[in-house]
Amino acid sequence: MKFKVIALAALMGISGMAAQANELPDGPHIVTSGTASVDAVPDIATLAIEVNVAAKDAATAKKQADERVAQYISFLELNQIAKKDISSANLRTQPDYDYQDGKSILKGYRAVRTVEVTLRQLDKLNSLLDGALKAGLNEIRSVSLGVAQPDAYKDKARKAAIDNAIHQAQELANGFHRKLGPVYSVRYHVSNYQPSPMVRMMKADAAPVSAQETYEQAAIQFDDQVDVVFQLEPVDQQPAKTPAAQ
């Protein structure tokens, strides 16, 4: 896991962030914006694969689509993919028209069924995609990378953003010879984690690599931000020493 903290500008008094008037104290204060970014190596992939079958009637189209999906599910089970990681209930049938001379002519029906697979062993990715095509599933809709435990990375990013805000405030207070006071207000920016789409990429002049290596695995980034208003207090003055009696 790669970890980094990004510091944004922190301002004295009025900051660039859109703070409401009642979010700022009347007295001296500091506004800081703490941010952090945590990079995680993907450990799961979500596959969406579709079968699209045409036939003379809807029942036949559905039957053929079901047979192909059943064949692929058997393949997945042979590859130790748990049933809870397989979803195949999505099915739709629709009329299939041919258009000639501005007229629509019914030529049959189509059945479309989607299989979604959560893959927890990324080294099996290529074989699962090949298996889908061999089973007659004719469209790979998407392959997205993610992490199995995103909350753990979100918590790390949030804690780092809080630490970053406190560090900025403390440094500014010290620089202006003030004492950092209590927190007056906090504004938290809820960040959304999105799985990263995986793209098969291959340069023409690249050295030979295995088929599995042609699937790039970009890091998943978890960003967090928290804006904090701290009150400022004057540094305690040392009492003047009384001259010693002569």
Swiss-Prot record:
InterPro entries documented for this protein: 26kDa_periplasmic_antigen, SIMPL/DUF541
Pfam family, one: SIMPL
Single GO BP term: cellular response to reactive oxygen species
Cysteines paired by S-S bonds: none
Superkingdom of the organism of origin: Bacteria
Protein name: Uncharacterized protein YggE
Annotated source species: Escherichia coli (strain K12)
